[in-house]
Regions:
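Intrinsically disordered, low-complexity RNA-binding regions enriched in Gly/Arg/Ser/Tyr
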Residues: 1-42, 48-82
Length: 82
C-alpha cells in the first residue's frame, strides 16, 4: 500500500521516515520528493508498505502526530488527476 506523508521538515532524510514507519512493519520503499535546493525535500513523500494491515495501523497511529515541532499528515496515497 502506498502511503502519503506530508508536513515534513524540508531537511528530513529517508532514514528519519524509516525510523517512524518500521515500528509498524515491513517497508518496501521510501520516496521523499526532492526540492530544487540540494539536500532538501519539498516537505512530503511516500512510503510503500506491502502489508495492508500494517500500513493501515501506521496511518492511524502516525497521522496528526507532531515530529520535531511539525504536525504530519499520513494517509493512503491517491493518484493525481491528469
Amino acid at each position: 500500500m502506498k502511503i502519503f506523508v506530508g508536513g515534513l521538515l524540508y531537511e528530513w532524510k529517508t532514514e528519519m521516515i524509516k525510523e517512524q514507519f518500521e515500528k509498524y512493519g515491513t517497508i518496501s520503499s521510501i520516496e521523499l520528493i526532492p526540492d530544487r535546493k540540494p539536500g532538501f525535500n519539498k516537505g512530503f513523500g511516500y512510503v510503500e508498505m506491502p502489508n495492508e494491515e500494517e500500513a493501515n495501523k501506521a496511518i492511524s497511529e502516525l497521522n496528526g502526530i507532531e515530529l520535531n515541532g511539525k504536525k504530519i499528515t499520513v494517509s493512503i496515497a491517491t493518484e493525481r488527476k491528469k
